[in-house]
Amino acid sequence: MDCKIDIIPQVLHFKQPAGTSRGTYTTRKVWYLHFTAPEFPNWVGIGECAPLPNLSCDDLPDYEEVLAKICRQVENQGGKLDMEALCKYPSILFGLETAIRHFFEGSWALWDTPFSRGEAGIPINGLIWMGDFNRMLAQIEKKMEAGFRCIKLKIGAINFKEELALLQHIRSHYSSKEIELRVDANGAFSPTDAMEKLKRLSELDLHSIEQPIRAAQWEEM
């Protein structure tokens, strides 16, 4: 099938600075893919490629050039994806898969579920971005007032003792049955102190501790 993939870059602006252990985001660049085919002139499939700077494994300095090259290859292959070759570019694979599936479905309603019909929501965690103690506490209180019962905190940017105190503050007011706590260090801990920090965190009855050390540190894990 003849097909065409247009790449549309956009810069999204965060409503407030989003802090992680790798820095603070104020903007995020994304690339939207528009998949079309002359055979079906009224159809369009839209996908999104959105790697996170310094976090995604395919955050490349020449990302846009790589994306353009892959899109041309997919066009030449009639819209077929080489899944094995694209595994090392997960954000590109996601964008292409989404666009192609949307195109052939002919609708945003990819699945017939209460959520896709707008009849019910999906419970998710309330994400707390990194900041100083008071700012993070204010975010937590706001999420809880909004009805969230699962709170996920980004940790690793401020003093560990302050982050621990923040978690202890929550636990002193809410048990694990009332509030489920999750933390994400984004690889901020070093292999030398990770075990001690994990031990201290485990005392707070956390649901999970995501990526304590950096990716690909296989021996240390």
Model-derived segments and spans:
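Active-site loop segments of alpha/beta catalytic cores
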Residues: S190-L198, P212-M221
